[in-house]
A protein has these predicted regions:
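Short loop->beta-strand "edge-of-pocket" segments that line small-molecule binding or catalytic clefts
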Residues: 1-8, 93-107, 199-206
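Short, polar/charged alpha-helical segment
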Residues: 4-37, 61-63, 111
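A bilobed periplasmic-binding-protein/Venus flytrap-type ligand-binding module shared by bacterial periplasmic
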Residues: 16-18, 80-90, 178-193
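A local structural motif
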Residues: 20-32, 46, 118-132, 145-146, ...
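Short helix-initiation/N-cap motifs at beta->coil->alpha
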Residues: 29-40, 53, 127-143, 154
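A ligand-binding cleft/hinge motif common to bilobed small-molecule-binding domains
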Residues: 51-64, 114, 147-165, 259-260
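Pocket-lining segment of extracytoplasmic ligand-binding domains
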Residues: 136-220
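Secondary-structure end/capping motifs
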Residues: 191-266
Length: 283
């Protein structure tokens, strides 16, 4: 089985490093740059499933690709946030109107921003979205090229130690922010296989939580790692790495997000979210 791995999905990144992970699946871990590339790789057959935040599978459904949900992590309340400069006049989401906001657009960042704005009576059209790409977004924020920055672990933890940065919104109070593991209907992953994938993700996640120092050392030793073992241990201790098979509650969360993003004009047409592989059928 070809399993997609990108730097921002900690579960699969750890699975690639963890001894014996997915052994029964004869795994080939396929590295790629970021979660928004997942649908294209699934479409080409380069991977059989991947893990992302909540938005990429909805983007896939918007393109008519028929996303199929396999599993979901626990909510990740500490994994994402909107940051501003300490000297900024921005004190609440209502103050973001007309401001330049750096984010990975089309990821869960877009949903976090939309829900935060909605709570203040604003919409995505009321702000200027700046694609962060490969730029140094922390520097862009500190030096005033953007007014706010939507970010996630492990960059978030580093940014929060910066003396010039303030936390505006933490995603835990705004969206579930789960890690989702999904495929496309064309790959025909059977219900039993989906259940087995979910169980293995959960097993690895619980093994990591039982030996955080080992997992942190593995992450720190990766080429181009974003932090040392101590900083990775801090990230891991903030996470519940347990995983469950995708069920109706997950599909309902995804549909709520799809409707929110449509309401904000991110999608031009309504999107019906995908089915669950682990239950062997549709909604």
């Amino acid at each position: 089985m070809k399993i997609g791995v990108h730097p921002n999905n900690l579960h699969l990144r750890l699975a690639r490093l963890w001894p014996g992970a997915f052994e029964e699946f004869d795994p080939e871990f396929v590295g790629y740059r970021e979660g928004r590339d997942t649908a294209a790789l699934l479409e080409k057959g380069d991977i059989h499933f991947g893990g992302t935040g909540s938005t990429p599978p909805i983007e896939a459904d918007a393109r008519g690709l028929s996303a199929v949900y396999i599993a979901a992590s626990a909510p990740r309340p500490a994994n994402g946030a909107i940051l501003v400069r300490r000297d900024s006049p921005i004190r609440s989401a209502a103050d973001l109107s007309g401001k330049r906001i750096s984010l990975i657009d089309g990821s869960f960042h877009t949903y976090l921003l939309a829900r935060s704005l909605e709570g203040a009576g604003l919409g995505l059209a009321d702000v200027i979205r700046i694609e962060s790409g490969d730029s140094d977004s922390l520097r862009d924020l500190v030096e005033g090229r953007v007014d706010a920055w939507v970010t996630m672990s492990p960059r978030l933890e580093k940014a929060l130690t910066h003396e010039e940065i303030n936390l505006l919104v933490r995603c835990g109070s705004t969206i579930p922010n789960r890690s989702l593991f999904w495929t496309l209907a064309r790959h025909n992953i059977a219900g039993e296989t989906g259940q087995a994938i979910a169980a293995e993700l959960d097993r690895v996640g619980r093994a990591v939580m039982a030996d955080i120092d080992k997992a942190a050392a593995l992450l720190a030793a990766e080429t181009g790692s974003e932090g040392d073992a101590q900083s990775w241990a801090k990230v891991l201790r903030s996470r519940d790495l347990s995983v469950v098979a995708a069920a109706e509650n997950i599909l309902a969360e995804q549909q709520e997000e799809a409707e929110t993003l449509y309401r904000h004009g991110h999608f031009s047409l309504p999107v019906l979210t995908g089915q669950s592989a682990s239950t062997g059928g549709g909604r």
